[in-house]
């Protein structure tokens, strides 16, 4: 039973090494065996090997790590298509695609999201609601008035949230 358990443990370590380093399974097995199945030692030797210029032909490059995007020109193209002006629209592109939804999912939230106070708190600054000035700051009223936002925006704060949420759930 212990032999099977060791084999299983070695296979799990190989798989974990492949996921961590982004190399092939046979290379991971060789490095782990050379390091006497010490994961950190094998990982350290893998990345030290990557820094030696003479090993570039033999080295297996990482596949999909944050430092190396899957396809760099495509990533640049996607970033160049993102426009800040697309976010408030919330519509679908003319071709029927969902590029506006994707750009909203990748962009920061709408400006009113950052400017408005939390819904359960009274805003610090209240604009006068009537020209005669009947309302004062100590007059706390909890009616269903929308909280003021600065800078003023033409789109309501609840508008673009639904497409963003549906776009995010659709990508999973």
Swiss-Prot record:
InterPro entries noted in UniProt: UBA-like_sf, UBA_8, UBALD1/2
SUPFAM superfamilies cross-referenced by the UniProt entry: UBA-like
Residues spanning the membrane: none
Gene3D superfamilies (alphabetical): DNA helicase RuvA subunit, C-terminal domain
Compositionally skewed regions (Basic residues) per UniProt: 135-145
Region annotated Disordered, chain positions: 118-172
Stretches with biased composition (Pro residues): 118-130
Pfam family, one: UBA_8
Family per record: Belongs to the UBALD family.
Protein name: UBA-like domain-containing protein 2
Gene that produces this protein: ubald2
């Amino acid at each position: 039973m212990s032999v099977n358990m060791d084999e299983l443990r070695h296979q799990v370590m190989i798989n974990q090494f492949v996921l961590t380093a982004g190399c092939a399974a046979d290379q991971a097995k060789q490095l782990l065996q050379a390091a006497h199945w010490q994961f950190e030692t094998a990982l350290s030797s893998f990345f030290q090997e990557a820094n030696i210029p003479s090993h570039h032909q033999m080295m297996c490059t990482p596949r999909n790590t944050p430092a190396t995007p899957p396809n760099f020109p495509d990533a640049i193209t996607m970033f160049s298509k993102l426009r800040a002006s697309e976010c408030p629209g919330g519509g679908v592109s003319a071709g029927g695609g969902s590029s506006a939804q994707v750009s909203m999912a990748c962009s920061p939230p709408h400006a009113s999201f950052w400017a408005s106070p939390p819904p359960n708190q009274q805003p610090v600054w209240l604009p006068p609601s009537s020209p005669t000035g009947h309302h004062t700051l100590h007059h706390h009223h909890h009616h269903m008035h929308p909280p003021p936002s600065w800078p003023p925006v033409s789109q309501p704060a609840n508008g673009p949230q639904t497409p963003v949420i549906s776009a995010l759930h659709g990508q999973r």
